[in-house]
């Protein structure tokens, strides 16, 4: 299921793992966004970073711009093939993809993930913003918008030739998010929500809105950072992931608030 699967990147195979953590990156991100997670994560956790078309080893493939098309492809590629418990972690756009994939599995009658961790993301029912059409901006305006998110190094944004290569995938990711149509259907699994206290793009109400997306428990964790807090606060984020897995009885000895 993960071996020789173009959708899954595992830097450190964990044959004795007790839980598998699928990680979904933000718009413009890739499996490389989680490259340093396996070495820092509890050894009982197998970190599997998702590599979507249009980036990394799949750079020559056309990116997908429809959420239903993407989750259908992911649903087939990641369909459970063993008894190892799985948890989804997604940041920003990745949170939306992880959420919709969990719902897709439920519709298909597949074993649901044991938990969903959504990070840096508005609740899906509160995502729609008709005034926000970043995927329609010209290149200069889109690069300026990326700078506002504070997730891309300024020297990269200033590299004209490199941005010419990256912008089509970034634009496709924004189209994926901005064309998303929400339909209410709460999950039957626990959710944990991670958010930055200084995130200018997400309000506390939009964070708390995730509670309506599950019939199970929903825990909210705040971090002292902006929209991309998962990078500078990596160790704190990973420690909170581990405690959350313990809270869900997937890791022993790590139960915590």
Task: Tell where the protein language model's regions lie, with residue ranges.
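Domain-scale detector for complete catalytic domains at protein termini or as standalone homologs
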Residues: 1-89, 96-257
């Amino acid at each position: 299921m993960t071996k020789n699967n173009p959708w899954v990147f595992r830097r450190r195979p964990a044959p004795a793992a007790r839980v598998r953590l699928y990680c979904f990156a933000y718009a413009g991100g890739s499996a490389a966004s989680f490259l340093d997670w396996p070495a820092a994560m509890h050894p009982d956790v197998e970190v599997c970073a998702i590599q979507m078309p249009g980036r990394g080893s799949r750079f020559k493939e056309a990116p997908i711009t429809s959420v239903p098309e993407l989750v259908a492809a992911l649903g087939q590629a990641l369909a459970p093939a063993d008894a190892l418990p799985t948890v989804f972690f997604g940041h920003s756009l990745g949170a939306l993809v992880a959420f919709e994939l969990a719902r897709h599995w439920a519709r298909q009658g597949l074993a649901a993930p044991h938990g969903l961790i959504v990070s840096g993301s508005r609740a899906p029912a509160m995502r729609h913003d008709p005034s926000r059409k970043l995927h329609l901006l010209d290149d200069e305006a889109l690069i300026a918008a990326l700078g506002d998110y504070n997730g891309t190094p300024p020297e990269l944004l200033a590299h004209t030739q490199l941005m010419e290569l990256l912008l089509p995938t970034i634009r496709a990711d924004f189209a994926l998010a901005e064309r998303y149509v929400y339909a209410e259907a709460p999950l039957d699994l626990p959710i944990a929500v991670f958010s930055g206290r200084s995130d200018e793009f997400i309000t506390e109400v939009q964070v708390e809105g995730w509670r309506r997306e599950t019939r199970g428990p929903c825990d909210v964790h705040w971090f002292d950072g902006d929209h991309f807090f998962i990078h500078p606060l990596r160790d704190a984020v990973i420690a909170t992931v581990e405690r959350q897995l313990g809270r869900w009885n997937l890791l022993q000895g790590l139960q915590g608030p």
